């Protein structure tokens, strides 16, 4: 086989491998149920893998509400970083495969392969965007923190009314509550305020609800449908390609019978020739006929 043809074949194989790996990996990450998210007292100061690709860490000083306010960091976790690396490798293999098709000028024979590859590329891009969208950490963690802060301040009997109002001033500013000069009335207004934790969007696939649980968003059903169709199409196509390759290899390995140079294909006898004694009667007849 020509060197360029070998490279072209291997570019096909590598692209198929990366396509299937990315499609399966990103699909799993896109439908993974998020972990518990919020202002978790027992995990303050630790990195918490909340979604499949993102983690957050709350500053431990946020617990000292007398001098500090809420502060937290968001970053990609190991799965998120691995997903970016895998996606870059997939894009490079896709481009390399296109280059090889162009070099050997095999656009027409590779038309079906290109159509399937582009469909898979669009599906992978769709999944990659979904898993890379940053979750709604800000609203969820803030709601959780201020719910905790309000309960702590109202239950702390050592604080004066003025001190409670000073500490809860961040609560008032965050939720845009009216500023009231009377400390007792202001605290009453804060106590009546209800924080909305129902049906908040966490990421494209899940919504966040009170009591720290998640429900499926409408988009996840669209993801199931799109990826299901792509799975079926790619499975049928690649299965047919594998069968075709196996049949081709089988034909090449068939043992053909060697023909004689004169064009005849005579099989050799396995049995040895038997030696037959001459018939006396026939000999007498031949002598009479002078044969």
Curated annotation (Swiss-Prot):
Keywords: Cell membrane, Membrane, Transmembrane, Transmembrane helix
Major subcellular site: membrane
Disulphide connectivity of cysteines: none
Membrane-crossing residue ranges in chain numbering: 13-33, 84-104, 111-131, 219-239
Membrane topology label: Multi-pass membrane protein
One GO location term (cellular component): plasma membrane
Compartments in which it is found: Cell membrane
Protein name stated in the entry: Uncharacterized protein UU183
């Amino acid at each position: 086989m020509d060197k360029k043809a070998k490279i072209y074949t291997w570019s096909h194989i590598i692209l198929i491998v990366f396509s299937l790996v990315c499609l399966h990996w990103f699909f799993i990450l896109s439908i993974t149920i998020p972990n518990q998210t919020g202002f978790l007292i027992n995990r303050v100061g630790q990195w918490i893998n909340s979604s499949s690709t993102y983690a957050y860490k709350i500053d431990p000083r946020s617990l000292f509400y007398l001098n500090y306010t809420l502060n937290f960091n968001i970053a990609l976790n190991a799965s998120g970083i691995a997903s970016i690396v895998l996606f870059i490798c997939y894009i490079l293999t896709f481009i390399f495969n296109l280059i090889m098709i162009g070099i050997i000028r095999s656009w027409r024979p590779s038309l079906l392969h290109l159509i399937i590859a582009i469909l898979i590329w669009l599906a992978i891009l769709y999944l990659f965007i979904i898993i890379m969208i940053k979750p709604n950490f800000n609203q969820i963690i803030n709601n959780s923190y201020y719910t905790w802060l309000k309960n702590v301040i109202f239950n702390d009997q050592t604080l004066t009314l003025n001190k409670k109002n000073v500490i809860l001033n961040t609560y008032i500013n965050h939720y845009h509550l009216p500023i009231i000069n009377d400390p007792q009335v202001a605290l009453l207004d804060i106590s009546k305020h209800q924080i909305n934790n129902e049906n908040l969007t966490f990421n494209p696939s899940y919504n966040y609800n009170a009591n720290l649980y998640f429900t499926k968003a409408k988009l996840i059903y669209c993801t199931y449908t799109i990826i299901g169709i792509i799975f079926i199409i790619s499975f049928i196509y690649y299965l047919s390609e594998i069968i075709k390759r196996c049949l081709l290899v089988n034909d090449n390995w068939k043992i053909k019978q060697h023909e004689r140079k004169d064009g005849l294909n005579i099989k050799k006898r396995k049995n040895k020739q038997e030696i037959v004694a001459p018939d006396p009667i026939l000999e007498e007849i031949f002598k009479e006929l002078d044969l």
